Design a protein with these regions (language model features):
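Short amphipathic alpha-helical segments at helix boundaries and their inter-helical linkers
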Residues: 9-15, 77-80, 114-119, 187-189
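Accessory "access/gating" subregions that flank catalytic or transport cores
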Residues: 18-24, 30-39, 48-58, 68-74, ...
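Short low-complexity stretches enriched in small and charged residues
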Residues: 2-7, 40-44, 149-150
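Alpha-helical transmembrane segments that form the membrane-embedded catalytic/substrate-binding core
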Residues: 44, 79-87, 181-190
Length: 190
């Protein structure tokens, strides 16, 4: 917690809320829960590359680090589940290049009923049934409309949509993920 207060410059959204909570005496994961309307957002899963890089081919180690990091500003929200999912995918990607197998690894690490898993399963259903990527994108948006914009379930699915529908073509994967819209710096970077 002290590192966050002293070294993390942003004061907006989940970052500012968790820092304020810690200054008020709450420790993680409560710092990411209390009065935090952003606990389902994207701030944690976009930081997971470091944990995967520190634990290549070791998803369980990567998700341990990701969970410790994510709970500070996302508590037990969907943002933390997204970080766990993405850290597992990225860590396993050091030794696997089968996108579907990577997604299955990520899904195996998060609760089946969480919204991140729900969005990923909807994506897989669309892909497996030959649904056009734009239609799939719209279904993902509709499915998570109650959460609002800049939320992890839909945006993680957008990143995975790019990889699935891109079918191994890096440029196409990037274009698809970014063209889904919403938090495009997150979806494109992942």
């Amino acid at each position: 917690g002290e590192y966050w207060i002293d070294s993390i410059p942003p004061h907006w959204n989940e970052y500012g809320i968790c820092k304020g909570n810690m200054r008020g005496g709450l420790v993680p994961p409560l710092s990411g829960e209390y009065h935090n309307d952003w606990k389902d957002s994207n701030g944690a899963w976009i930081r997971t590359e470091i944990w995967a890089g520190m634990a290549p081919a070791s998803p369980d180690t990567a998700i341990r680090y990701a969970r410790e990091d994510a709970c500070v500003d996302h508590g037990s929200g969907e943002g933390t589940y997204a970080a766990i999912f993405v850290a597992a995918v990225e860590s396993a990607a050091f030794v696997l290049n089968d996108i579907r197998a990577l997604i299955d690894i990520g899904l195996s690490k998060i609760p089946e009923k969480c919204r991140v898993a729900q969005s990923i399963r909807l994506l897989l259903d669309c892909y497996d049934n030959g649904v056009d990527w734009k239609v799939c994108r719209n279904r993902l948006v509709e499915d998570s409309a109650d959460l609002g914009w800049f939320e992890a379930p839909c945006n993680v699915a957008f990143a995975m949509l790019g990889m699935l529908y891109g079918e191994g073509d890096f440029k196409r994967s990037m274009i698809l993920a970014i063209n889904c819209g919403d938090d495009t710096d997150c979806t494109g970077a992942t």
